[in-house]
Structures are given as structure tokens and as C-alpha cells.
Design a protein with these regions (language model features):
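Mixed-charge, glycine-rich, non-catalytic linkers/tails in nucleic-acid processing enzymes
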Residues: 21-24, 76-77, 81-161, 262, ...
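Carboxylate/His-rich catalytic cores and anion/metal-binding grooves
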Residues: 7-8, 203, 255
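Active-site-proximal helix-loop-helix substrate-binding element of RNase H-like nuclease domains
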Residues: 7, 14-16, 20-113
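A non-catalytic, amphipathic alpha-helix used as a structural packing/dimerization or gating element
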Residues: 104-119, 247, 251, 297-304, ...
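DNA-dependent DNA polymerase catalytic subunits
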Residues: 126, 130-218, 223, 259, ...
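Proline-aspartate-enriched helix->loop->beta-strand connector
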Residues: 1-7
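Conserved phosphoryl-transfer catalytic core
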Residues: 219-232, 237
């Protein structure tokens, strides 16, 4: 968090001492811009230099951690951490080091620098930033910027065709397009469930059906245009996005062949951003006919694929956006791989034949046999018999040995950072026993006994993010906000600086006295 912590602190020190913060080349000043939204968040521009913020860069590269603090990320990736990891004790110890042991303070600071550098080195983050910048035209230290990146790739191609793009103030909103298609699930515990997954579904739809801003303008004038949705029609000849995606697709395949994972990831993120860009009012090409012709086509493809599979006497128990979950059952043990591979091949062939007939296009849809769950659980919605959505768990075999397996959880407590460690661990062990046909009743009773005997207090800690300033929580004051306010009151009495006034993460427990911050638990 170099911008909003390190550099902001240095700026405040300079202000206090009436110094100019000259960090740029040629003694140029650092330039600050306050974020339009966010708790005291700033952007920093340093002339002639690039500032790479590790947190923002890792989020851009789709890393996911419960906590993006240097201590947590370094423990996860490097298996080592800061020399002092307790927030409050760290402040006291740093002050003591400054006053009594400056070499020790230097060691502490140097280790922080080593941790950051080693994370960047291990994960190739600088290479990712360079590849992303080369691909999108964005500055190395600009994060997000999908619309600007789209303009960088699309506008020159549009201009070479002799067209000028509309200005943002010329846009009109024409309703809302739906999101991805999510099927109603059939709850239960199953044997042998396979997942068939469309490879990059939305980019494939754009290529197949010529979804494109220029193609839309031209297609509305043509009699033989490819039909879209909500009045959209797309030219068979004049389209830029399909060609652009084809080039990116080829480049990604080449990057994979060259084992260039960094470039492959950058290209994937770029291709997958096109749908979102076309659906935002911040894009000069925004038109619901474009977006709905992608999402509604996705709905149509998912429903038709489900029907194709069920006509072959296999049950589809769930589907979500680009994935279909197919039940094979215990009788197919030993044939799962063969069935999954054949189903995917048959479905790809069927789509090629169908789309060649109507609307007369080449199909770039590609479904793959992705995962085999030897055991699979689709839960019900709490308090209902209806199947849930975006929540499931399964056991995947990774080898032939007894212990060669892994558990996969989606949307359940075990993968939610705002649930306690006990809840997550309990769910993992319980599901593991159920999937492996092991007894679980005594385990449940044992956990309940130990819980009532207060053996799990450290595992009952909850962790949640404060997304606004504490003072901004007025009408609705959830438990984690109450805990943060208690923590700030205790810190104020002890003469400690504020920790949560501007947001952040809070760890707390639910007690008979209400929510209490973990670090000040009585």
C-alpha cells in the first residue's frame, strides 16, 4: 500500500516541516489526486517515475487473499513474514527501536522491503505489469482502466475504416440487459458429476455472432444481417471485435505454447473485459443491443446445451453462466472420462452444425470436459426445499491412492472470509467425512461439546471489512461496526492512534455483551 500509506505519510511529514516533496525526476514534485470515492484514498503521479502498488497490482492480476496485508500475503507466498506482526505491539516496538536500537529498526525496514521485492519476483508482477501495459496502452501504474484499454485497441481500427466514434455525452441508456444464465439447481448428494465448461464463452459469442459496435451500425442497414437481441442486427462483413478477439486468442495460445503465463493471463483479462466494457455507461460504444446480444445469446446457448445433454439420457442438475453440471451416477464409474470427453465433442459438433444452418455462421463455441466430482453436494436454500445457486461442494480425485483427493467449495462457509475459522474447519471436515462415507455423527457431537466447554474461543473470531468511515454508519450499524467503535474507544483511552476511523478490516467476536474487538477482548 505504498501510495496511501508510505507516500501519504512522507507527504504529511514534508508538510509538517514545510518541505517540498520532490520525488520526481529533475526535482519535480509529487502530484496528488483524491479518489472520487473511497475513504481518503489518493492517486500519486511522480513525473518520470512509476509507482507499482503491490496490492492493486495483485488484485488486477486476479489474486485473491483473505487479507492483502504484507504480513498475510508474505506468509501465504513466501512462508515468512514481518519481524513484528502485531499491529499495536509493532508501533510500540518500532518506537523503542528508533529510540534505542536504530540498527534493529533498519533490519525491520529492510526485511519489509525484501518481502515486497521477493513477492514481486516470485509472482512475476513487474513482468505482468509490463505485458499488460504493452497490450492495453495503459500506464504501468494505472489499475482498472478497462474502458481506456478498449478504446486503445478499438479506436484506431475504427478510424482506419473511416468512422468516428461517438462522444460520451451522446449516449442514451435503453434499458438493462440481463446477467449470466443461472439454472435452478436440483439439491442432493450425488456420485460422479462432471462439469462441461464453455471456454471463454462471451468472447466466443462475440466472434461467432459478430457482436461489434461498427457491426451493429452496419447490420441495421443490411437485409442479411446476423440477428441479435432487443433489435440488434450485426453485419456479416463489417465487424472489428471478432477479428480483434481472434488475434488475441491466437496470441494467447502462442503465449501458452511458449510457457509465458504472464502474457497469457494479461490477454485473458483483456478479452474477458470486453463484455463488461460494452455494458458500462462510461464506454462511448455503450448500447444495450450489444450487451443483450451477448448475455441473452449466452442464455440461449446454455438452455440448448442442457436440452442436448438431457436428450442423451443424462440429467443436468445445475448450470451457471458458462458451466453445465451433469449427473452420471454410480453406474458410470470407470467410464466418466470417456463419457465427458464424448459429450463435449458431440456438443461442439452439434453447435457447429446448428449455427451453420441458422444464422449461417462459423461456430467458435468450444465446450470442454473440465472437472469430475466423484462426490458432489448441491445444498438447499436455508429454510426451503429449493436448490441453492452459486453454492456447492465436491470431492475431486487427483490420483489412484486412497488419499489422492481434494475438496472444492464454492460460495459456502469454508471459503467465506467473514465466517469464523471454526465454521470453515467444521464444514470442511464434515463434508470430507460425508464424501468419503466415513462416520460423522460422533464428530459433530464432539465439536458441540468442545464448543460449550469454551475450547474454541480463538477459532470463533469473525473478520469483516469496514467499507466506509465509522461516522458514516448511522441508521444501520452492523456487528463489525459496533466492534470497531468499541476498539476505537479503548484505543483513545490508551492514547493510541485511530485504526478504523477510515475503514479497514476488523476482527471481532460475538459475546453476551455484544460484538467485541478481538485484540481488546475482556
Amino acid at each position: 500500500n505504498i501510495v496511501n500509506f508510505d507516500l501519504r505519510c512522507l507527504q504529511k511529514f514534508c508538510d509538517r516541516l514545510n518541505l517540498v516533496f520532490k520525488l520526481g525526476r529533475n526535482d519535480e514534485n509529487i502530484i496528488w489526486r483524491k479518489a472520487a470515492q473511497g475513504n481518503d484514498r489518493f492517486y500519486a503521479l511522480v513525473p518520470g517515475r512509476v509507482i507499482l502498488d503491490g496490492i492493486e497490482l495483485m488484485r488486477t492480476a486476479t489474486y485473491s487473499f483473505e487479507n492483502f496485508s504484507l504480513e498475510h500475503v508474505s506468509r501465504q507466498l513466501l512462508h515468512r513474514g514481518k519481524l513484528v506482526d502485531d499491529v499495536d505491539e509493532r508501533g510500540k516496538e518500532i518506537t523503542d527501536l528508533f529510540e534505542n536500537n536504530k540498527p534493529g529498526l533498519a533490519r525491520y525496514n529492510l526485511e519489509d522491503c525484501r518481502l515486497v521485492w521477493d513477492i514481486f519476483e516470485k509472482e512475476n508482477l513487474i513482468a505482468f505489469a509490463i505485458e499488460r501495459s504493452s497490450l492495453t496502452g495503459l500506464e504501468l501504474d494505472r489499475y482498472g482502466g478497462s474502458v481506456a484499454a478498449f478504446d486503445y485497441l478499438y479506436l484506431p481500427r475504427l478510424h482506419r475504416k473511416g468512422f468516428v466514434a461517438p462522444a460520451l455525452d451522446q449516449l442514451e441508456s435503453r434499458g438493462v440487459s440481463p446477467g449470466g444464465y443461472v439454472m435452478d439447481s436440483i439439491p442432493g448428494i450425488y456420485d460422479n458429476v462432471i462439469v462441461l465448461d464453455f471456454k471463454s464463452l462471451y468472447p466466443s459469442i462475440i466472434r461467432t455472432f459478430h457482436i461489434d459496435p461498427l457491426g451493429l451500425i452496419k447490420g441495421l442497414e443490411e437485409t442479411d444481417a446476423i440477428p441479435g437481441f432487443d433489435g440488434g442486427r450485426f453485419s456479416r462483413e463489417e465487424a472489428l471485435l471478432p477479428e480483434l478477439i481472434e488475434k488475441l486468442w491466437t496470441a494467447r495460445d502462442q503465449a501458452k505454447a511458449n510457457s509465458n503465463a504472464v502474457l497469457s493471463q494479461a490477454i485473458k483479462l483483456m478479452m474477458n473485459s470486453f463484455y463488461g466494457v460494452l455494458g458500462t455507461l462510461g464506454c462511448r460504444f455503450f448500447d444495450t443491443r450489444l450487451v443483450s446480444s451477448i448475455t441473452k445469446r449466452g442464455h440461449e446457448i446454455m438452455i440448448a446445451s442442457r436440452d442436448f445433454i438431457e436428450q442423451r439420457d443424462y440429467q443436468v442438475i445445475y448450470g451457471d453462466t458458462d458451466s453445465v453440471f451433469v449427473l452420471l451416477g454410480p453406474e458410470c464409474e470407470g467410464q466418466v472420462s470417456e463419457i465427458g470427453t464424448k459429450l463435449a465433442a458431440d456438443l461442439n459438433l452439434w453447435w457447429r452444425e446448428q449455427l451453420a444452418q441458422s444464422p449461417g455462421v462459423n461456430s467458435y463455441l468450444e465446450i470442454e470436459f473440465e472437472t469430475h466430482y466423484s462426490k458432489f453436494l448441491m445444498p438447499t436454500v436455508r429454510g426451503s426445499d429449493a436448490g441453492s445457486k452459486k453454492r456447492y461442494a465436491g470431492l475431486v480425485r487427483t490420483g489412484t491412492g486412497r488419499d489422492d483427493y481434494g475438496l472444492i467449495f464454492k460460495g459456502l462457509e469454508s471459503v467465506r472470509s467473514d465466517w469464523s475459522q471454526l465454521a470453515r474447519h467444521f464444514q470442511q471436515v464434515l463434508y470430507e467425512r460425508v464424501f468419503l462415507d466415513q462416520p460423522y455423527e460422533e464428530y459433530v457431537k464432539e465439536v458441540v461439546r468442545d464448543l460449550l466447554d469454551e475450547k474454541f474461543e480463538d477459532e470463533l473470531v469473525l473478520r469483516k471489512r469496514l467499507r466506509r468511515k465509522l461516522v458514516d454508519y448511522v441508521k444501520n450499524v452492523p456487528p463489525h461496526v459496533q466492534a470497531a467503535r468499541k476498539a476505537e474507544a479503548i484505543r483513545a483511552e490508551s492514547g493510541l492512534p485511530t485504526l478504523y476511523d477510515s475503514g479497514g478490516w476488523i476482527e471481532y467476536l460475538i459475546t453476551v455483551n455484544g460484538p467485541e474487538p478481538r485484540q481488546y477482548r475482556q
